From Swiss-Prot:
It catalyses: L-glutamyl-tRNA(Gln) + L-glutamine + ATP + H2O = L-glutaminyl-tRNA(Gln) + L-glutamate + ADP + phosphate + H(+). GO terms for biological process: translation. InterPro entries: Amidase (IPR000120), Amidase_dom (IPR023631), AS_sf (IPR036928), GatA (IPR004412). Its EC number is 6.3.5.7. This is Glutamyl-tRNA(Gln) amidotransferase subunit A. GO terms for molecular function: ATP binding; glutaminyl-tRNA synthase (glutamine-hydrolyzing) activity. Pfam families: Amidase. It comes from Bdellovibrio bacteriovorus (strain ATCC 15356 / DSM 50701 / NCIMB 9529 / HD100). GO terms for cellular component: glutamyl-tRNA(Gln) amidotransferase complex. Belongs to the amidase family. GatA subfamily. Keywords: ATP-binding, Ligase, Nucleotide-binding, Protein biosynthesis. The lineage of its organism: Bacteria, Pseudomonadati, Bdellovibrionota, Bdellovibrionia, Bdellovibrionales. The keyword Nucleotide-binding applies.
Amino acid sequence: MDLTFASLSEISEAVNNRSISAKEVTLHFLKRIENLNPKLNAFTSLNPQAVQEAEAVDARIANGEDVGLLAGVPFGIKEMFCTKGLTTTAGSKILENFVPPYDATAVARLKKSGIVVMGKLNQDEFAMGSSNETSFHGVVKNPWDLERVPGGSSGGSAAAQASRLVAGTLGTDTGGSIRQPASFCGIVGVKPTYGRVSRYGIVAYASSLDQAGPMVSSVRDAALTLEVISGFDPQDSTTTQKQVPAWSQNLKADVKGMKIGLMKEYMTGALDPDVQKTVENSVDTLKQLGAEIVEVSVPMTAFAVPVYYLVAASEASSNLSRYDGVKYGYRAEFKNLSAVDLEEFYSQTRGQAFGAEVKRRIMLGTYCLSSGYYDAFYNKAGQVRRLIMEQYLEAFKKCDVILSPVTTAPAFKIGERVSDPLAMYLNDIFTTSTNLAGLPGMSVPFGQSQSGLPIGIQLTAGHFEEQKMLNVAFALEGASLVKGKHPHVI
């Protein structure tokens, strides 16, 4: 077994039957992190207890205990998740030394299944970004081309997974933050139905949109990880009590008779020719496998980006008001003169510690929620959001799964769009509507640009229909033009 490219279940099975120890696996990936992370900047910190955690897994197996589905599997965790005893910064200076006293539910469930936490992964500050250029920890580089972005906000997770610094990673998706970097880095990323995975212990950006999901190397690995982290959590009132299906066991590449919807609004002239060709190839593949392709229309997605930025910024302006330097996190220093009043203390702390993009969105959100504009902006955005969801529900009466591009183009160069917020926001043009409607969505690698950059296909399903989506992805994965290809940095 080649540990570097082994699947989650292969590693777990080998650890469980003691053909390799969890400690050996951990040391193997720690060496990879040591060698490659300086080039990528994917990890912000390492878990000093990783080897001891692996030894504990080995000891439990030696005692005949059932360690779990992911015994000894090394995982990287996005900075957005609280991890007991490990710094959790959300990519921001304002939380630079924050160490949570507890684990996020998703992390706790992964630990219960036997994983070894290798460390924390870089991200855009408070998940606000599409390129991983807003992080307090610096820019993450795409392992396929070190001059390009890995996508965002879960860029560290995508880069670490694509370069196999770990066997699996965890990300969050508020408007495409799992799917877009997954596409840019050629991995599988899944955003489940809103409420499928607990948000407890995830640093809040936009509470009605945030969702956690796996960023891994295969559809089966994604299904397996999703099984572990999903399910009702009394700590999060938005989680569903629906039973968690055995997605990984029910995976099948048989799409014969399935109706695949092709989103009319997304097949525009704005698509890069390589992306257009990849979508067309995926459609042809599914036709050959027996699926029926039908055109579907969700006209209100034309307003998805402005609606998303109104809703997300408004919720962020409320959520981020808790960071004031009083109880935890960064606090402004007043060496020569103390703060005149509490307001100055707050403004100095936040002014010094929040990045430019976070400040921009807080200002936008505060403006949208102000008394004179609440109805015109926030309320109106909520009404359009409802229409988007209703139109999606109508579309799913005609098809099982909707297929579309993830982004208009492959990964762009570092610095290319950072000074143009509008161009950066339009990266989310195909992904935000899924979050607004609370639907499950994913990116599966399928093609490459002429310059060798990976291109993913986005699949979206009805609420709690992850199995259909995963099955179509499994079929596409089997016929993928990039299967078995890896970044040169490896």
